């Protein structure tokens, strides 16, 4: 078995759950691309970000199995698209579909992918039931603003443990002000924040110098944010992670 000699830090949520302080994003990634990363992935823990909408849950599962990376060292993030229920499927059916495609008996983190559908409050209440059954460790949301979080809390009495926020491409000062307000609100409520595409997407990331990327990551780590990296370049991934760990 491969000896994973590199150790990474953790973030603790308000429920006391402990998760790696970065995640591997799989948006637009194929099975082969994920497999190539996992073959040389040198760290002792792996948090892997998936979603029904990415249409690659089965590809992620196959890549993990083929890579030989220990399943007991993996934290899975899954996301339900509230629009899926327009087809008549229940939250439970969609959740069980994710477990089946990922080939796992339960999931570590399960999120609502966005608040665009009017059904997100109903979805949230059903997710609480699944968590109470022991099928989900932590429930969260993705790209929820303050008003949407308040709405699900008012209807359920339960705040998300995690809010994953995609950082806007070509972000204006106003965009980043809005993101910062959400981060501050979440942290005030004890909600952990994940920064997806922390450099604003691949196009913007390629335009940034190493120093600029380092400054961004240090700012995010100073706020205890988890970063979700979607790169398919293992050198870039390891460099970003090393900067995060150095800044701890």
Task: Cite the ranges covered by each PLM segment.
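Short, well-ordered coil/turn segments that N-cap beta-strands
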Residues: 17-22, 44-47, 69-74, 104-108, ...
